[in-house]
Each structure stands twice: as C-alpha cells, then as structure tokens.
C-alpha cells in the first residue's frame, strides 16, 4: 500500500509526525507537506509564483518533500510529478484543531483530501479537537491506522472522501463513532484595526465560534457529545433539488440569446 501524507500545519507539525510513526508498519509512506503553517488556505493553489520543493529527511518514510505552497499544491504536485498516480490513499492531517461543518470550506486539511480525490485517489482528512500546545496525537494516529486498515479490507472506491474529527478525550471517555453530515459553524468575525509605523491600516481577524443549536446527526453535534465523527463528503456543490426549478424559471430568457434552447 502506498500512502501520501500531507497537512496544512506544516511538515514538522506533531500531527503528521504521529501519522508517520503509526502508519509506517502498514504502508509505504510518501510525505508532501507545506514548509510552514498554511491553515485556512482552503482549496487555493499557487499559479503566479514558483513552487519551491526541498527533499525532506524524515525517518520512517520512503520519500518526502517540503513544499513552498498550499496543501492543495502539495497533493497536486505529488500526484502529478513527485510520486505519480499510483497512490493508494491520501491522508491529510492530523490537524491541530477540528474541521467541522462549514469550516471544511476554509480548511486546508480537508481541501488537500478533496484534491486527492480529484487526482484519482481515495482520501481521508483527520482532525483532533484540540488547540493545546501539548496536544497528544497518539490515539488519533492509532485510530487513523485502524480506519485505513478497515477501509482497505472492505474495499474503497476512488471517489471515497472521509472527514474524520476526533474529540480530545481519553479513549475510554469517547462514547463511540457516528457517521454524520456536515453541520454549521458560525463565528463572531471580529476584526481588530491597527496601524503600522507609517500610518497604514491593517486588520487582525479574530472572534470565537458561536455556540448554536446543531442538528442531532451533524458532525458538530457528535464531537460536542464526545463521539468521533466520520462524514463522507464530495466536491460536487450542485444544489440538485433546485436544478429543475431554475431550468423552468430561466427558460423565458432564451429568446435573448437567439434561438431557444430546449436543454437550457
């Protein structure tokens, strides 16, 4: 089995190092991860600057690269050039902090996994619900190994994309596993205005998560109630139940485009 590891916390982050230590016994590991913290970069790619690549010297891996780009750059470059398209699984994480609900749209961790699927490899994103500096990733890494072994034992489609969030609790205090859907995460969205020595204005974004009621089957609710959340997701954002409605409502505009198109 050939696994590509990546993240958005940087190649030296403790989460990805824990995965290297845990997965080396079950797979041939390749690592392509950012050269620094790249959290919150979403699905951005680097198109107007060169992407610098340096070989990484890490124990327990087949090959590794420090990438001067985003998490999506890492997966795209590894799949296209560095490793090739014979990657059996992309694992993104373990993220230092959760990636729940609508936050997946901002998440570099989840976006890297999405890119893995786009490039033809099944993928999982793993996040641990802790921001503490002394966070212990060992249980999350062990759980990830068990998930991977189960997926390959039972078969895994190339379009598989799982977003896993693990509560930061002692294993015996975790109540179980829930297969969930994405919830909603809203923030205070505070912007602190400051001025540099030359008088130019800049802002620091801040504000915490708003504690709001969540649907019982959501990932947010699961982690709040001490369950591991596993959410199957995909990158097709089409709102299918509105497609037919808007086909009808916009058909009246066809005459503005010339001959009417019955397939509008």
Swiss-Prot record:
Q: What does this protein do?
A: Nucleotidase that shows phosphatase activity on nucleoside 5'-monophosphates.
The cellular component terms of Gene Ontology attached to this UniProt record, alphabetical and capped at eight, are: cytoplasm
Query: What is this protein called in UniProt?
Result: 5'-nucleotidase SurE
Looking up HAMAP family in the UniProt record yields: SurE
Task: Enumerate the cofactors the protein uses.
Answer: a divalent metal cation
Q: Which domain of life is it from?
A: Bacteria
Just give the chief location class: cytoplasm
User: What family does the entry list?
Assistant: Belongs to the SurE nucleotidase family.
Q: Please name the Gene3D superfamilies in this protein's record.
A: Survival protein SurE-like phosphatase/nucleotidase
A Pfam entry, by short name: SurE
Annotated a divalent metal cation binding sites: 8-9, 39, 95
Q: Which reaction does it catalyse?
A: a ribonucleoside 5'-phosphate + H2O = a ribonucleoside + phosphate
Q: What is its EC number?
A: 3.1.3.5
Q: Which UniProt keywords apply?
A: Cytoplasm, Hydrolase, Metal-binding, Nucleotide-binding
């Amino acid at each position: 089995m050939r696994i590509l590891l990546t993240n958005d916390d940087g190649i030296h982050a403790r989460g990805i190092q824990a995965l290297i230590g845990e997965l080396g016994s079950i797979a041939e590991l390749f690592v392509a991860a950012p050269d620094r913290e790249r959290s919150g970069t979403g699905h951005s790619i680097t198109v107007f600057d060169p992407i610098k690549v340096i070989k990484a010297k890490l124990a327990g891996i087949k090959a590794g690269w420090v990438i001067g780009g985003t998490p999506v750059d890492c997966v795209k470059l590894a799949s296209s050039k560095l490793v090739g398209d014979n990657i059996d699984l992309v694992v993104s994480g373990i993220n230092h902090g959760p990636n729940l609900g609508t936050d997946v749209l901002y998440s570099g961790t989840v976006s890297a996994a999405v890119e893995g699927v786009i490039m033809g490899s099944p993928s999982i994103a793993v996040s641990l619900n802790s921001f503490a500096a002394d966070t212990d990733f060992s249980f999350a890494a062990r759980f990830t190994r068990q998930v991977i072994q189960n997926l390959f034992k039972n078969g895994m489609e190339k379009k598989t994309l799982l977003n896993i969030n693990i509560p930061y609790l002692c294993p015996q205090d975790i109540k179980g596993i829930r297969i969930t859907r994405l919830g909603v995460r809203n923030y205070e969205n505070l912007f602190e205005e400051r001025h540099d020595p030359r008088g130019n204005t800049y802002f620091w974004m801040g504000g915490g998560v708003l504690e709001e009621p969540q649907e019982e089957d959501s990932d947010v609710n699961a982690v709040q109630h001490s369950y591991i959340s596993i959410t199957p997701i995909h990158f097709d954002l089409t709102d299918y139940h509105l497609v037919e409605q808007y086909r009808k409502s916009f058909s009246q505009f066809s005459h503005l485009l010339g001959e009417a198109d019955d397939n509008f």
